[in-house]
Amino acid sequence: MGIHISNLVKIYGSSTVVNQISFDVADGEFVTLLGPSGCGKTTTLRCIAGLELADGGTIEIDGVAVSDRSLGIHVGTHERNLGMVFQSYAIWPHMTVASNVAFPLQVQGATPKAAIDEAVRWALNIVGLDALAHRHPSELSGGQQQRVALARAIVGKPKVLLFDEPLSNLDARLRDRTRAEISRIQKELAIPAVYVTHDQAEALSMSDRVIVMSAGVTVEEGAPRDLYRRPSKRFTAEFIGAANFLAMTWDGLVWRTADGSAVDIPAEQQAVAGEKREAVLRCEVLRVEPADVVLDRMHIALRGTVRGLQYMGPHTEYAIEVADATIVAHSQAEFTVGNLVNVTFRPQDVHLLPANA
């Protein structure tokens, strides 16, 4: 039955850090709370875990109310049947891998030793650490320590998995591998999961659904592909990936940029004459061509001037002054500051934000 959160509120002093947040997580679904520091995502997670006392709203896990301030309900963390992986691994340095994983079952006191040993073997096999059961944390890599924390979170067959920025202490390459491992394990076990991060790549690659948060409220939620390609809010477009924005006005026939350049985009994105909107252009859909190149009819072209550049290895990142705005584009072609260029893109790659987004 997953997780149900309705009108969750958390207040610290005079600050409302979580303000009427509502969402559901279905069985087997992986939902990410994504947002900048201070947006309320970790506080929301801690309320789900029972580590914070909510000031309003309700939280249900597997159909059972675990938090409802109006009814005086606050079920303790140890009674919520959840597993949690923290930003810091939080594993005991004096215990072996097996002992760390067994610890949650041992403190419950009601599980026979043989059953604990079997559960530990199962959890370590799931995370691929069964051969390292007798090692101590000091003998493990950072990625292996994080897998110990994950094994400990799943050993009790929890109803819910919670992740509080678990990859932030890993290097980039190890982060990618561990990200894939967490996704595999969560899907294999079909446990509803809530994952907190400020990292857009983690949110997009791991999630069935992403909830974008800012200043304690939900800005927008949806499937990763939809939020990236067709966001309904400017904040989402800015926060998820690199985006360029162009002011557009509909003249009755075509959309025009601030300098009058025509941008002929699909009819379903048209509006009434005089309406002003913003167009979102992702860096990767833009091509940078010399100004004298003959253009095909499949692409829209805007004339611009290179104002800055940074060599990034696979590509060069160009800052190009176009239509009274500066846009960022990636290209393997070589230009210098001051070059006149054409920035080209396909009509279907333009996304017009709704009015007042």
Predicted regions and their residues:
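Conserved ABC transporter NBD signature motif
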Residues: 57-69
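Conserved A-loop
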Residues: 10, 22-25
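Conserved coupling/switch loops of ABC nucleotide-binding domains, chiefly the family-specific signature
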Residues: 55-58, 215
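Helix-to-loop junction immediately C-terminal to a conserved catalytic motif
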Residues: 49
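ABC ATPase nucleotide-binding domains
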Residues: 81-83, 87, 91-235
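Glycine/charge-rich catalytic "coupling/switch" loops of P-loop NTPases
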Residues: 254-308, 334-357
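The feature captures the beta-strand-to-loop junction immediately N-terminal to the Walker
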Residues: 34-36
